[in-house]
Amino acid sequence: MIYLDHAATTPVPEEVAHAVYDTLVSGWGNPSSQYPIGKQARDAVAAARETIAAALGCKSEQLVFTSCGSESDNWAVRLALHQNRHAGKHIITTAVEHSAILETCKALEQEGYSVTYLKPDKNGDITASQVESALRDDTALVTMMLVNNETGCIFPVAEVAQLLKAKKSRALLHTDAVQAAGHLPIDIKAQNIDLLSLSAHKFHGPKGTCVPVSYTHLTLPTKLE
């Protein structure tokens, strides 16, 4: 079979599979423990963090590993709204986001949030001017994917970031970059992105490993509810 559907998932290269296997066999210690096998696991996690952070233009402590892209999206949106709760209860997103974003927004509407869903044009594109028109004084979050998972359209996330900065908006910017990783350059600091979600299996990594990234002033949670 000739496999071309890398937007759905990607094969794991042998070197990645070997790295996972080696970790399962010889690096299985509890990273919180103080004996050698624990230190080995702790060092491996730290090295992985540094590698990913260098690729994304952020600090290693701003990375959180989750189980899937949907969890990353849910977590990022709710974190942004919680920490930016004094800005207001308005969200801007697109009508063609991944269901993890759309379903979260629907749930948030039931919790009292107002959500503006931007519709794409006939070519599937969304423009920064649409975001500008929808922007309100009480907008707390703009969440927009970087690349659409069905059409392949690239959304103007960097332009939206510049817009929010120029308007001195209090809104935070989250982007689901799951389909963009490995295809488009990503630099969280340079592109003024507050939160970003990735999923390893979309760019030849193992399934069940995803990363929501918090860049600017957001404080990552220290406990699970």
What annotation goes with each model-predicted range?
Residues 217-225:
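Single conserved hydrophobic/aromatic residue that forms the stacking wall/gate
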Residues 1-218:
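Pyridoxal 5′-phosphate
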